[in-house]
Regions:
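Polytopic alpha-helical membrane-helix bundles and their juxtamembrane interface segments
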Residues: 1-221
């Protein structure tokens, strides 16, 4: 259950996220630099003031690494791609925190039909993505492909919660994980020289992903 303070921080997050998306759409560097570093700390405060704190340290870790990754990618946008790997590593650490939370919460583990279906879908999409990235012959091919596995982990982790709490929580977590994967797919396609989007779409899907993951975790727990 969310406290009134947690709800306020959730609403504040959505306002700041909207500001960042508008800043990206208008290509306003000042708005982007002001709003993006605020996103993960606000979500962290939302957890801090919520009444559900099951393994909260893992969520603090996920959002802290998300904050670090956001900062690295901000620097990357100004200095070229030398910060890209550091940003990607930070987000991978955050994904591991999310997956560990899902894994520890979902004990005893159950192999349900949604998990099996999700596994086969992840395998099919990952195989296609790897072929696409390898075809580009980009020098970051292997790190990008490995990162894709981290996205698979949080998708499957969200499905592990099936039957361990309210269905709404699982669906929110799953939607957040899928949006995270889509956001990172857009970034990856840009990195290999095949952009499909603009920065506003990346931030729209990313900010929603983080918000839905946290909301889903709070609901399911």
């Amino acid at each position: 259950m969310l406290s009134s303070q947690a709800i306020i921080f959730g609403m504040l997050y959505l306002v700041v996220a909207a500001g960042n998306i508008i800043g990206n759409y208008r290509e306003s560097k000042s708005i982007i630099w002001i709003t993006k570093p605020l996103l993960m700390p606000i979500l962290l405060l939302m957890i801090l003031f919520s009444s559900e704190k099951v393994n909260a340290w893992l969520l603090y870790g996920a959002l802290t690494f998300g904050f670090i990754g956001d900062v690295f990618l901000l620097i990357n946008s100004q200095k070229g791609n030398k910060w890209f790997i550091l940003g990607m590593a930070s987000f991978m650490a955050g994904h591991i925190c999310y997956f560990t939370w899902f894994l520890t919460f979902s004990q005893p583990l159950r192999i349900d039909i949604p998990l099996v279906v999700g596994l086969f879908i992840c395998i099919a999409i990952t195989r296609w993505f790897w072929k696409t990235v390898h075809a580009s012959q980009h020098h970051h091919t292997w790190p990008i492909c490995f990162y894709c596995l981290m996205i698979d982990l949080i998708v499957l982790g969200a499905l592990l919660t099936w039957g361990h709490g309210p269905l709404l929580g699982t669906l929110l977590c799953l939607t957040g994980a899928i949006l995270f994967g889509f956001s990172d797919f857009l970034i990856a396609m840009r990195v290999i020289g095949e952009p499909l989007d603009d920065n506003a779409m990346v931030m729209l899907t990313y900010t929603l992903a983080q918000f839905l993951l946290i909301c889903g975790i709070l609901v399911v727990s």
